[in-house]
């Protein structure tokens, strides 16, 4: 791996620096660290002065998060922040706010790419020009994708910045007269006028003795002949870099004619002719051999770049499509150009089909392209396809979590921006359906679950349906109780999942789609009374009875169904819905299942229903007494499971059962369940039980004179485990509950 690629991969695998963490936290919590002035702008409460490098990074971080506006730029007023290199990309600020926040600093660089239309290039330069120090010392100015002037499109303003060395003014209505003014700047060395309204570049002759870098990508309005253009270029003898690339829209022979010139651009080290017609390997090689100092040639979207000389493996870097090295160089250099990003990704996709090694450096380049062009469908489509190929199966295991987090965020954004594009949605779901991503990578799982559910409700593709419910089942288990309740409260979600269960039951089909759908419903109803009510109101109970009857030998199906019905039984308000003789009869028969997982959940349903007393039991009293005896005897026959067969968000649903001294079978089920999870996963459940006040409940059982001996024995065993846990780890402090996935 080349040194720069290795560095990129190492950077992603490393933890964020302390400075990055602090700045990100400050950025997302500005209201906690700032107070508001009378005009509504923010100022930091602490009086200290930030070092210049930190101030620059803070500004960049706020801009990156899309939080730079008239209010937040107030932080940079005064002298508390000392800016030198200011990045305000895509800021939403007014001309007045810009002047107050930035024009008193000693700026040497300003990147104002894509700021909102309320501020023009004239506003920015007028503000900068009000500071004499900036007039003489501002060296680099980036004004891409802005409006020149709202009042007077012919207003000239660049001459104020006499110290300017580098100017980028792409995607702007920038005319010949503006070029003439810029070319007269006494120190100008680098100029990017890509995709402007220039029709004639003759004005560049005014800076022919200074200009070292000239970028003229996609000059669509140029009216000069090829000979006239070359006559100007020939005079620019000090050029080190020349870019005349295009988006494959024109048939001009300018590139080939330039390559054939022997007496032109003697100091050139970098030439970009990507997207140009008539470019051949022979012509490119001859041009480079006449200029042995050449370090880069751009050949993407041309017919060249396929010879051994141009493979890009030596000191000469080549952007192209012939191999991975060329494609990576293209993605690196053209990250701001949507057409070239799409071209490079298209060719990368064909390579990644057979990729066997993890390529974090390549994935990072794909991420950059996705981030820079969020609303460009062709880019997002190609990028999402590449992401899947780069992260599928075991390849994801070698990817840094930090990089996968960025990828996942961008995939979700793509799904949000293009909800009706089926192939894009499919690409994103394919990538998201990864254990590595769903289990290990930090991202907004709540928003992801909502997006996937919306897709599921709008599409009927069977293969994609399986993936969607798999994703939802895992995400739902990772959400907090509050988030699960909020997600399940959306009636359409429960209805859609039940529809899938009904469809599979009618087809008598036990497949992964059915299993994942049942898991999703199980997780969504966990400690969520609203979701449980939606389940009942949508005839979920009747449907799940059919499932139990349709698949009597499928223990994994029975376990999931009974697990969800446990959640329903926990909700006291829904108790009467379960007082249904056929339902109770079927559950009681499953209590005697040879599969401990099935018997366990059947017992849980019965325990919850019996725990509410004789008055709440509206069926036969003799049946209740019989069930109590069966419950007690069944639990005593259970073998110790080899692994953790269930997971719980909290022990709160168990505590009411622990007080049922007149129904020992109910208590026995509760303590057996608690001992099971505490013995299989003590670090999680012992702490949880102590935090939630379980010790007192267990002591009550231990000391109560009516306690069943089997219940008492298990309670004492749990207390011993808890005491050992406290000795080993100390008494755990109160903490937020962490959601836990069920074992599917």
From Swiss-Prot:
LRR repeats: from-to residues: 185-208, 216-236, 237-261
What SUPFAM superfamilies does this protein's entry cite? ARM repeat, RNI-like
Looking at the UniProt record for this protein, which Gene Ontology cellular component terms does it annotate, in alphabetical order? Cul2-RING ubiquitin ligase complex
* Stored PROSITE patterns: LRR
What Pfam families does its record include?
Answer: LRR_Zer-1, ZER1-like_2nd
Provide this UniProt record's keywords sorted from A to Z.
Answer: Leucine-rich repeat, Repeat, Ubl conjugation pathway
Which PANTHER family does the entry link to?
PROTEIN ZYG-11 HOMOLOG B (PTHR12904:SF21), PTHR12904
Family membership: Belongs to the zyg-11 family.
Q: How does it assemble?
A: Interacts with ELOC/Elongin C. Part of an E3 ubiquitin ligase complex including ZYG11B, CUL2 and Elongin BC.
The protein here is known as: Protein zyg-11 homolog B
Lineage, broadest ranks:
Eukaryota, Metazoa, Chordata, Craniata, Vertebrata
């Amino acid at each position: 791996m080349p040194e720069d690629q290795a560095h990129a991969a190492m950077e992603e695998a490393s933890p964020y620096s302390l400075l990055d963490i602090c700045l990100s936290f400050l950025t997302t919590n500005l209201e906690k660290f700032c107070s508001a002035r009378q005009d509504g702008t923010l100022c930091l409460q602490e009086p200290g002065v930030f070092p210049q490098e930190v101030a620059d990074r803070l500004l960049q971080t706020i801009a990156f998060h899309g939080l730079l506006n008239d209010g937040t730029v107030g932080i940079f007023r005064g002298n508390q922040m000392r800016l030198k290199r200011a990045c305000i990309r895509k800021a939403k600020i007014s001309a007045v706010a810009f002047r107050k926040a930035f024009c008193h600093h000693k700026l040497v660089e300003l990147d104002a790419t894509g700021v909102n239309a309320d501020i023009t290039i004239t506003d920015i330069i007028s503000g900068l020009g009000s500071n004499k120090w900036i007039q003489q010392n501002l060296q680099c100015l980036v004004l891409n994708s802005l409006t020149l002037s709202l009042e007077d499109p012919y207003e000239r303003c660049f001459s104020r910045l006499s110290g300017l060395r580098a100017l980028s003014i792409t995607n702007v209505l920038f005319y010949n007269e503006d070029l003439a003014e810029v070319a007269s700047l006494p120190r100008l060395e680098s100029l990017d006028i890509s995709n402007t309204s220039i029709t004639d570049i003759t004005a560049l002759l005014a800076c022919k003795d200074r200009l070292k870098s000239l970028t003229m990508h996609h000059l669509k309005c140029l009216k000069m002949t090829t000979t006239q253009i070359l006559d100007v270029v020939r005079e620019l003898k000090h050029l080190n870099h020349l870019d005349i690339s295009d988006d494959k829209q024109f048939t001009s022979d300018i590139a080939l004619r330039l390559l054939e010139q022997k007496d032109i651009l003697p100091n050139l080290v970098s030439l970009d002719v990507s997207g140009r017609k008539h470019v051949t390997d022979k012509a490119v090689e001859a041009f480079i051999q006449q200029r042995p100092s050449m370090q880069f040639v751009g050949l993407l979207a041309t017919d060249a770049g396929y010879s051994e000389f141009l493979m890009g493996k030596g000191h000469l870097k080549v952007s192209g499509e012939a191999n991975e090295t060329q494609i990576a160089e293209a993605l690196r250099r053209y990250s701001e150009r949507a057409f070239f990003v799409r071209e490079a990704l298209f060719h990368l996709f064909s390579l990644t089909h057979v990729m066997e090694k993890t390529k974090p450096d390549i994935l990072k380049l794909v991420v950059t392209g996705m981030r820079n062009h969020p609303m460009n469908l062709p880019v997002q489509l190609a990028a999402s396809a590449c992401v899947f190929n780069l992260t599928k199966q075991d390849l994801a295991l070698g990817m840094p979590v930090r990089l996968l987090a960025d990828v996942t965020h961008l995939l979700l954004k793509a799904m949000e921006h293009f909800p009706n594009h089926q192939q894009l949605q499919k690409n994103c779901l394919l990538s998201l359906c990864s254990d590595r991503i769903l289990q290990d990578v930090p991202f907004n799982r709540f928003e992801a679950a909502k997006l996937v559910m919306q897709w599921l409700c709008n599409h009927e593709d069977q293969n994609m349906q399986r993936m969607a419910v798999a994703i939802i089942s895992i995400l739902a288990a990772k959400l907090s109780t509050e988030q699960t309740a909020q997600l399940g409260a959306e009636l359409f979600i429960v209805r859609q999942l039940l529809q899938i269960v009904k469809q599979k039951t009618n087809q008598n089909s036990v497949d992964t789609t059915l299993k994942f759908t049942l898991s999703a419903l199980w997780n969504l109803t966990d400690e969520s009374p609203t979701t449980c009510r939606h389940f009942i109101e949508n005839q979920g109970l009747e449907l799940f009875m059919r499932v139990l009857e349709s698949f009597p030998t499928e223990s994994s199906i029975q376990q999931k169904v009974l697990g969800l019905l446990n959640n329903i039984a926990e909700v006291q308000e829904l108790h009467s819905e379960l007082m249904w003789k056929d339902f109770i009869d079927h559950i009681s028969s499953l209590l005697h299942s040879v599969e401990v997982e099935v018997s366990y959940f059947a017992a849980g349903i019965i325990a919850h229903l019996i725990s509410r007393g004789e008055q709440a039991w509206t069926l036969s009293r003799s049946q209740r007494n019989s069930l109590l005896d069966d419950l007690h005897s069944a639990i005593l026959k259970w073998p110790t499971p080899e692994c953790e067969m269930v997971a719980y968000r909290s022990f709160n649903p168990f505590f009411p059962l622990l007080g049922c001294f007149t129904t020992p079978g109910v208590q026995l089920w509760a303590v057996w369940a608690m001992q099971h999870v505490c013995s299989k996963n003590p670090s999680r459940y012992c702490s949880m039980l102590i935090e939630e006040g379980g010790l007192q409940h267990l002591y009550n059982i231990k000391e109560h004179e009516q306690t069943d001996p089997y219940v008492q024995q298990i309670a004492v065993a749990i207390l011993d485990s808890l005491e050992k846990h406290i000795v080993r780890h100390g008494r755990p402090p109160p903490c937020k509950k962490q959601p836990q996935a069920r074992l599917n």
